[in-house]
Regions:
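Amphipathic alpha-helical transducer elements in NTP-driven molecular machines
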Residues: 36-43, 76, 142-145, 168-171, ...
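Short helix-coil boundary/hinge micro-motifs
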Residues: 1-10, 42-45, 156, 172-186
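Compact, Lys/Arg-rich rRNA/RNP-binding cores from ribosome-related proteins
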Residues: 50-87, 151-156, 161-171, 175-177, ...
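Helix-rich interaction surfaces within compact, conserved domain-sized segments
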Residues: 189-242, 246
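N-terminal cysteine/histidine-rich coordination modules
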Residues: 1-100
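Extended interfacial segments that mediate partner engagement and assembly in macromolecular machines
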Residues: 86-162, 167-170
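Signal for well-folded cores of large energy- and translation-related assemblies
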Residues: 51, 125, 133-137, 152-153, ...
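Electropositive, gly/pro-rich neighborhoods at or near active sites that engage anionic ligands
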Residues: 73, 95, 100, 104, ...
Length: 255
């Protein structure tokens, strides 16, 4: 739901593709989970303000076309967006995005590719998979239902993630263990199936993932929230919540 122009974006995961109403030079920014001040930016489409780390930067190329810069590291000028993909695609199709870009960059020569929404979604997805891989290599991540259950009951799990095709029984069991260990009511549903989680981590049959380092959990949650917010927070959850449990018979042996 659209918020008033001067209201800060809050609530559910923020969508990575909302247009920021400001043009600025890219520069270093603090990482999620630390105590440093994070500047705000304004979405060029909705007019809502939000933390720079939560919005998506569009970098202006030499050809006058914008491209996704989800890590906000590209040099040169940029604009910011904070709407979901459906809103962005509609704005792009109807010319509203082009008008917003023209106002932000003060030039009518700026354009956006027709598949900008798809490009942003791909970039956000890649950012999540890369982050999971990095945390796994750093030893900050567990997979395997039995390992996760034990760590969760001891209070060592700071973020719990289920693949979209995880069985209902397995999810419920780990959610309960996490609650008993002082965690949240339930884990987050990953927007894709176990095959993608397994590929990202270089392991077989990864259905559940737990972050056992607080800072690592904050980094993964931030990347995952941005992706889920852009594609829609319920995207990928149908398989995990509707119909009979999926592969619940093997949940106890998930890697």
């Amino acid at each position: 739901m659209r918020k008033p122009p001067n209201e800060r974006l809050t609530g559910q995961p923020r969508t990575p593709a909302e247009a920021g109403g400001q043009v600025e030079e890219a520069g270093p920014q603090p990482s999620p989970g630390n105590d440093k001040h994070i500047p705000e930016r304004k979405c060029i489409l909705s007019g809502a303000h939000g933390a720079r780390d939560d919005l998506i930067r569009l970098a202006l190329g030499p050809d006058g076309q914008v491209a996704p810069d989800v890590r906000a590291k590209a040099p040169g000028r940029g604009a910011w967006i904070g709407v979901d993909r459906a809103t962005l695609d509609t704005a792009n199709e109807k010319g509203k995005l082009k008008g917003a870009l023209a106002r932000s960059f003060k030039s009518g020569a700026v354009s956006a590719p027709a598949d900008l929404g798809a490009q942003i979604e791909t970039a956000l997805r890649r950012a999540v998979l890369d982050r999971l891989g990095l945390e796994a290599r750093a030893g900050n991540l567990l997979s395997g239902a039995e390992k996760i259950e034990g760590a969760a009951r001891k209070g060592d799990v700071h973020l719990l993630i289920h693949a979209s095709d995880a069985g209902a029984d397995g999810r419920s069991k780990l959610d309960q263990a996490w609650r008993m260990g002082g965690g949240e009511p339930q884990g987050l549903v990953f927007p894709e199936e176990r095959a993608i989680l397994s590929l990202a981590l270089g392991r077989q049959n990864v259905v559940h993932v737990a972050l056992i380092d607080r800072a690592a959990a904050a980094r993964v949650r931030h990347a995952l929230d941005r992706w889920r917010a852009f594609i829609g927070p319920n995207e990928g959850q149908i398989a995990a919540t509707a119909g009979p449990p999926v592969a619940s018979a093997v949940d106890g042996y998930e890697g």
